Protein backbone atom coordinates (compact mmCIF):
# COMPACT_ATOMS: atom_id res chain seq x y z
CA UNK A 1 0.00 0.00 0.00
CA UNK A 2 1.01 3.59 -0.60
CA UNK A 3 0.09 6.89 1.00
CA UNK A 4 -0.16 9.81 -1.40
CA UNK A 5 -0.18 13.33 0.01
CA UNK A 6 -0.81 16.07 -2.50
CA UNK A 7 -0.58 19.78 -1.74
CA UNK A 8 -2.65 21.61 -4.35
CA UNK A 9 -4.22 24.98 -5.04
CA UNK A 10 -7.63 25.24 -3.37
CA UNK A 11 -9.08 26.43 -6.68
CA UNK A 12 -8.13 23.10 -8.32
CA UNK A 13 -9.72 20.88 -5.66
CA UNK A 14 -12.96 20.16 -7.55
CA UNK A 15 -11.02 19.24 -10.70
CA UNK A 16 -8.76 16.89 -8.75
CA UNK A 17 -11.73 15.33 -6.93
CA UNK A 18 -13.48 14.63 -10.25
CA UNK A 19 -10.29 13.16 -11.72
CA UNK A 20 -9.84 10.85 -8.72
CA UNK A 21 -13.46 9.69 -8.83
CA UNK A 22 -13.05 8.98 -12.56
CA UNK A 23 -10.31 6.44 -11.76
CA UNK A 24 -12.36 5.00 -8.87
CA UNK A 25 -10.37 6.55 -6.03
CA UNK A 26 -13.50 7.36 -4.06
CA UNK A 27 -12.21 7.96 -0.54
CA UNK A 28 -9.62 10.42 0.67
CA UNK A 29 -9.18 12.98 3.41
CA UNK A 30 -8.39 16.65 2.91
CA UNK A 31 -7.80 19.78 4.92
CA UNK A 32 -6.92 23.41 4.32
CA UNK A 33 -3.46 24.65 5.25
CA UNK A 34 -1.48 27.86 5.20
CA UNK A 35 2.18 27.69 4.29
CA UNK A 36 5.01 30.11 3.76
CA UNK A 37 7.05 30.15 0.58
CA UNK A 38 8.75 32.22 -2.09
CA UNK A 39 5.45 32.90 -3.84
CA UNK A 40 3.74 36.18 -2.95
CA UNK A 41 -0.03 36.54 -2.86
CA UNK A 42 -1.82 39.85 -3.10
CA UNK A 43 -4.73 40.59 -0.78
CA UNK A 44 -7.10 43.48 -0.21
CA UNK A 45 -8.36 44.26 3.29
CA UNK A 46 -10.68 47.22 3.88
CA UNK A 47 -9.60 48.73 0.58
CA UNK A 48 -5.88 48.46 1.28
CA UNK A 49 -3.74 46.20 -0.90
CA UNK A 50 -0.92 44.22 0.66
CA UNK A 51 1.30 41.28 -0.22
CA UNK A 52 2.15 38.29 1.94
CA UNK A 53 4.17 35.12 1.59
CA UNK A 54 1.39 33.13 3.33
CA UNK A 55 0.05 30.64 0.80
CA UNK A 56 -3.38 29.00 1.04
CA UNK A 57 -3.41 25.37 -0.13
CA UNK A 58 -5.33 22.13 0.36
CA UNK A 59 -3.73 18.81 1.32
CA UNK A 60 -5.21 15.52 0.13
CA UNK A 61 -4.27 12.29 1.89
CA UNK A 62 -4.98 9.07 -0.01
CA UNK A 63 -4.10 5.50 0.95
CA UNK A 64 -4.24 3.18 -2.05
CA UNK A 65 -3.08 -0.23 -3.21
CA UNK A 66 0.12 -0.28 -5.25
CA UNK A 67 -1.63 -0.79 -8.60
CA UNK A 68 -3.56 2.49 -8.15
CA UNK A 69 -0.40 4.56 -7.58
CA UNK A 70 0.46 5.55 -11.15
CA UNK A 71 -3.14 6.36 -12.21
CA UNK A 72 -3.62 8.38 -9.00
CA UNK A 73 -0.44 10.41 -9.52
CA UNK A 74 -1.32 11.06 -13.18
CA UNK A 75 -4.88 12.12 -12.31
CA UNK A 76 -3.63 14.62 -9.72
CA UNK A 77 -0.88 15.96 -12.01
CA UNK A 78 -3.28 16.53 -14.91
CA UNK A 79 -6.11 18.01 -12.84
CA UNK A 80 -4.04 20.22 -10.51
CA UNK A 81 -1.63 21.72 -13.02
CA UNK A 82 -1.99 25.32 -14.18
CA UNK A 83 1.53 25.50 -15.56
CA UNK A 84 2.47 28.17 -13.03
CA UNK A 85 4.82 28.25 -10.06
CA UNK A 86 3.06 27.08 -6.91
CA UNK A 87 0.89 24.34 -8.42
CA UNK A 88 1.85 22.04 -5.56
CA UNK A 89 3.72 18.90 -4.61
CA UNK A 90 2.97 15.19 -4.37
CA UNK A 91 4.61 12.96 -1.76
CA UNK A 92 4.44 9.15 -1.80
CA UNK A 93 5.31 6.90 1.12
CA UNK A 94 4.96 3.22 1.95
CA UNK A 95 2.26 2.05 4.35
CA UNK A 96 3.34 -0.94 6.46
CA UNK A 97 -0.05 -1.81 7.93
CA UNK A 98 -3.57 -0.43 8.18
CA UNK A 99 -6.11 -1.25 10.86
CA UNK A 100 -9.85 -0.70 10.73
CA UNK A 101 -11.50 0.80 13.81
CA UNK A 102 -15.04 -0.39 14.39
CA UNK A 103 -17.45 -0.10 17.27
PLM feature segments, named:
Residues 1-103:
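Positively charged, small/polar-rich N-terminal and surface patches that mediate targeting and assembly
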Amino acid sequence: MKKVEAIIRKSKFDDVKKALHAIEVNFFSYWDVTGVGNEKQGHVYRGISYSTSDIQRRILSIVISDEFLEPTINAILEAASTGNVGDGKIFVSDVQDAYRIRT
